[in-house]
Amino acid sequence: MPGTSDILHNDVVIFNFPYPERWDSIGFDVMLYYAKRCIALPGDTLEIKNGHYRVSGYGGSLGNIESQDELARIMSTEQGVQWLIKQNCYYAYPFDSLLNWNIKELGPLYIPRAGDQIHLEHSSVVLYRQLIEWEQGAKLTEQKGCYQLGGNEITNYTFQKNYYFMGGDKTENSRDSRYWGLLPEEYIVGKVWRIWKSIDKSTGTTRWERIWKKIG
């Protein structure tokens, strides 16, 4: 997308959802769009601490703080954590038993940018396998501690694309990068500046008072 270099932290972005069929493999559905807030940019290192987003070197707030506070309140009790587990929304990307990340404590997670190189080991492969396979159109496999990409042995990998971490404003109920991973730059359609449609889920009626309101 032209102008993706202008995307900043907290911008609301519309994009083609990159995981339409399964969360471990990037695909494409031209009719499936999401709108989420940009939490982390290419080159950022992101963490989630007690449900709140943190990006190394960035001093401002990220995402909907009130919603993150509410999520932290829910997770402050074992009952709240168990409720989230039953809702299948507590454990987080990349759903690996060794990392054991969840929406309360996640990271640090580096957000790749084009030209970045990583060494292939268990943690890096778990985090970035789907990106590597999507960029190369080949399977990344492991045998006896050695990795092969499309049948060729590989020890390091250089990313060809930029990626973003996206978060929904309803932190306690949003299927975002905490669950499905990172967003490739070319899936971005543009920024969202104003609300053009708002439907009350309980009644199915249009919330006219929200139409054309500027998104902050």
Where are these regions (language model features)?
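Soluble "head" domains of membrane/secretory-pathway proteins
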Residues: 1-216
